[in-house]
């Protein structure tokens, strides 16, 4: 497959991902597609074409799996309905229970109050 056809396939993949991610939110759908179109018409010359194609496919994957939109429920304060679709990646949050290894967590955080929090 030639480079131009792979670039076009990546662009179409990203356009389909915007439809999945933004659904009926026309304002965000149009803005995302406009940004992608601008990136295709004026690509970053500092990146090789192969990296640009990979980046576009990575964007499409991110939009499909990680982006969730919320819509405020009318008549209820601070209540939002999340639009989780079949391609949304749902994690089990198992890593939250693991002991932190950052310098801040070892020293107890910024104020020292969480010294024994993760033990």
From Swiss-Prot:
Keyword Nucleotide-binding among record annotations: no
Quaternary structure (record): Interacts with RIP1.
Organelle transit peptide: 1-15
UniProt keyword Chaperone present: yes
Alphabetized GO MF terms: protein folding chaperone
Keywords for this protein: Chaperone, Mitochondrion, Transit peptide
CDD domains: Complex1_LYR_LYRM7
PANTHER family cross-referenced by the UniProt entry: COMPLEX III ASSEMBLY FACTOR LYRM7
The protein's name: Mitochondrial zinc maintenance protein 1, mitochondrial
Location in the cell: Mitochondrion matrix
Gene that encodes it: MZM1
Function: Assembly factor required for Rieske Fe-S protein RIP1 incorporation into the cytochrome b-c1 (CIII) complex. Functions as a chaperone, binding to this subunit within the mitochondrial matrix and stabilizing it prior to its translocation and insertion into the late CIII dimeric intermediate within the mitochondrial inner membrane. Modulates the mitochondrial matrix zinc pool.
């Amino acid at each position: 497959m030639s480079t131009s056809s792979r670039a076009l396939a990546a662009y179409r993949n990203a356009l389909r991902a915007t439809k999945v991610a933004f659904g009926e939110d026309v304002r965000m759908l149009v803005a995302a597609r406009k940004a992608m179109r601008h990136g295709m018409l004026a690509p970053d010359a500092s990146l090789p074409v192969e990296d640009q194609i990979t980046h576009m496919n990575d964007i499409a994957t991110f939009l499909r799996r990680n982006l969730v939109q919320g819509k405020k429920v009318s008549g209820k304060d601070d209540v939002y309905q999340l639009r989780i679709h079949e391609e949304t990646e749902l994690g089990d949050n198992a890593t939250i229970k693991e002991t932190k290894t950052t310098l801040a967590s070892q020293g107890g955080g910024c104020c020292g109050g969480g010294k024994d929090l993760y033990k």
